[in-house]
């Protein structure tokens, strides 16, 4: 039987329509969005999961992830080169200094970082007069490391030399090659460090609670594109839900193996600590945000006290959590 073009189109539409109706978040238009991230870290995993399993697509978005240094990503958000940046600390500090940006949600609220050292360095105190590698200067990991050293009676500006050693692989290599005595690396790289013969001195997540990553946007987009921001935040929050659901462990471990380029057993070992770092509601308590700002003031990253409303805007993530809670069976 032959059909006219109009009838064929009608039949095709009838087949497609039920699939569209069954997807509650699916929109007609597709928006291209860019998210800047600073490194191959656990902090990007919620976004990766949301992208891999089509959660942004279901929200009517096509995602492009762009590797970018934190300070540059803030500028890129302001100028509109990217819609979002995950460097929560850099976004918040920039906002505190008057730049037109805000953090919309917190993706990781626990510093899932290890301090690892070469053989013979058995305590944090033994780092006095020695060197410690970090990814970069001025970012959240830098400030977190200075705060951790202070908690252990070490002045990071006087008693310890903080040296930029780059990402986790190059930091481990820097210890092995004798360029530094220790380094700060994130989960799951402590498993790689241990296999390389390095010693774990401390896990920062045991002694401090700080927002390590989020989703930052410009004040202009908050005012002019609230629907886009709401959908992006909702997809990212669904990514957190996916990671935290133990039923998805196999899929999450698979993403870890692919993203971090590690073995399956290493991903399995690091899985538990990693998922603990993701706040289920995408927000943190005010006192945690205040502590983050206080550390930034103490280390000279910002000078003046500011209200939290100047640096964060959690309206979108709170609305998204309410919507998702209602949608649950």
Language-model region placement:
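Sec/Tat signal peptide C-region and signal peptidase I cleavage site
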Residues: 23-29
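Bacterial N-terminal signal peptides
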Residues: 10-22
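Short, glycine-/small- and polar/acidic-enriched structural segments
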Residues: 30-167, 171-177, 181-187, 200-209
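Pocket-lining segment of extracytoplasmic ligand-binding domains
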Residues: 89-90, 169-259
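Bacterial N-terminal signal peptides that target proteins for export
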Residues: 1-13
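Short linear loop/turn motifs
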Residues: 64, 71-72, 161-163, 269-275, ...
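Conserved C-terminal helix/tail region of periplasmic/extracytoplasmic solute-binding proteins
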Residues: 293-329
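Secondary-structure end/capping motifs
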Residues: 223-303
């Amino acid at each position: 039987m032959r059909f006219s073009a109009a009838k064929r189109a009608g039949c095709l539409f009838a087949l497609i329509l039920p699939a569209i109706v069954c997807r509650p978040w699916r929109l007609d238009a597709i928006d291209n969005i860019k998210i800047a991230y600073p490194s191959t870290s656990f902090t990007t995993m919620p976004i990766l999961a949301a992208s891999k399993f089509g959660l942004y697509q279901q929200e009517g978005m096509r995602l492009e992830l762009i590797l970018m240094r934190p300070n540059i990503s803030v500028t890129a958000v302001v100028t509109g080169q990217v819609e979002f940046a995950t460097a929560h600390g850099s976004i918040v500090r920039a906002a505190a200094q008057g730049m037109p940006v805000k953090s919309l949600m917190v993706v990781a609220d626990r510093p899932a970082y290890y301090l690892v050292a070469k053989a013979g360095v058995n305590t944090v105190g033994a780092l006095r007069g020695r060197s410690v590698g970090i990814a970069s200067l001025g970012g959240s990991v830098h400030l977190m490391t200075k705060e951790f050293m202070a908690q252990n009676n070490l002045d990071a500006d006087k008693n310890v030399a903080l040296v930029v050693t780059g990402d986790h692989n190059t930091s481990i290599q820097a210890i092995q090659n004798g360029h530094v005595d220790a380094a700060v690396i994130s989960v799951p790289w402590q498993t790689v460090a241990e296999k390389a013969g390095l010693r774990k001195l401390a896990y920062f997540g045991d002694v401090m609670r700080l927002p390590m990553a989020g989703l930052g946007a410009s004040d202009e987009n908050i005012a002019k594109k609230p629907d886009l921001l709401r959908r992006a935040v909702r997809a990212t929050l669904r990514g957190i839900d996916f990671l935290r659901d133990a039923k998805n462990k196999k899929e999450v471990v698979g993403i870890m193996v692919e993203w971090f380029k590690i073995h399956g057993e290493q991903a399995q070992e690091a899985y538990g600590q990693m998922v603990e770092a993701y706040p289920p509601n995408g927000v943190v308590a005010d006192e945690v945000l205040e502590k983050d700002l206080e550390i930034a003031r103490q280390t000279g990253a910002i000078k003046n006290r500011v209200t939290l409303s100047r640096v964060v805007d959690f309206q979108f993530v709170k609305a998204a959590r309410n919507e998702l809670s209602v949608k649950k069976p």
